[in-house]
Amino acid sequence: MKPNIHPEYKNITLTCSTCEKKHIFGSTAKKSSVDVCSNCHPFFTGDRSIQRTTGRVDRFNRRLTKSAEK
């Protein structure tokens, strides 16, 4: 193996954008983010409720039908 060609492997802190919990991982990346972690994901918490978020298309169609009714 050639010396000095491999990226630096270091510990980085990832913060969950949902629950703001911090996790430490080893990575070659300088910065990274996580939307849902094991602390707040329904699979790991045992929460059986379905969380549905409306996307852009659903919001657009809702606004379109609302404006057509006027």
From Swiss-Prot:
GO terms under cellular component: ribonucleoprotein complex; ribosome
Coiled coil segments of this chain: none
Keyword terms: Ribonucleoprotein, Ribosomal protein, RNA-binding, rRNA-binding
GO biological process, one term: translation
GO molecular function: rRNA binding; structural constituent of ribosome
InterPro entries given in the database record: Ribosomal_bL28/bL31-like_sf, Ribosomal_bL31, Ribosomal_bL31_A, Ribosomal_bL31_sf
Superkingdom of origin organism: Bacteria
Subunit structure: Part of the 50S ribosomal subunit.
The protein's role, per its UniProt record: Binds the 23S rRNA.
Family the UniProt entry places it in: Belongs to the bacterial ribosomal protein bL31 family. Type A subfamily.
Protein name per its UniProtKB record: Large ribosomal subunit protein bL31
Organism: Mycoplasma mobile (strain ATCC 43663 / 163K / NCTC 11711) (Mesomycoplasma mobile)
